[in-house]
Amino acid sequence: MLRAGAVLVVGTVLAGCTGGGLSGESGTAGGGSSAKYGTSPLTDPDGTKPGLAPISSGQDEATARELISKLQTKGRGPKTGYDRDEFGYAWMDTADGVPLARNGCDTRNDLLKLHGRKVQFRAGSDCVVVSMELYDPYTGKDIVWKKAKAAEVQIDHVVPLSYAWQMGAARWGKEKRQRLANDVLNLLPVSGSANSAKRDSGPASWLPPNKATRCSYAVRFAQVAKKYELPVTASDKEMMLKQCGG
């Protein structure tokens, strides 16, 4: 137990990582990870490892295209009836069937702990993050974050909830919608400005400004769509393939 006034500091340690990280902006063949960029989505199919490392090798791009090519396509349906509350209250810890559920910590703080470095918690807590450092895969920038300016880091739904609603989630039961909204596979802490710019866009309308991460982003989008049996629009699928050399 922490004494009052104490601050717990946690440094993120990645198994198999070297202190030097990756050279340049590239991922490693067959996936891999680095201390700065985190883990390639190709070796993190459930989203429980930190970061979103770039994919750049021809072999990895081919693997990415194979995944994306299997996605079904359909037109985007109406937004009628969509409301954020249809996916449960924000950052609920009780969405059964997803990693980190019912661990006593809300989804937002789970994500900050998972992806942040030099994490500091509120005194007496091992959940509430009050400061950290974050490499933002969307912008390629390092962020020094403090809870006093919480909006500088926001949690992005890789497949936006409104997008999912229009692509079929409107017909799901509430439990499945709650899983999508709180599944770490579909969540990344990123800069608030990037998240605000994305809104509910699919890949054809918005991609991370950091070009090195775009194939990885497409892979993560495809992983979520595959897991939840969501189709994507034809233009989104085409753009995703293009980011991975297609």
Please report, for each region that a protein language model flagged, where it lies by residue.
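Extracytoplasmic/lumenal low-complexity Ser/Thr/Pro-rich segments of cell-envelope proteins
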Residues: 24-35
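Bacterial N-terminal signal peptides that target proteins for export
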Residues: 1-6
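Domain-level detector of nuclease and nuclease-like folds
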Residues: 137-246
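Bacterial signal peptide processing site
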Residues: 18-21
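C-terminal motif of bacterial Sec signal peptides marking the signal peptidase cleavage site
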Residues: 13-16
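Cell wall/extracellular polymer interaction/catalysis modules
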Residues: 33-141, 146-149
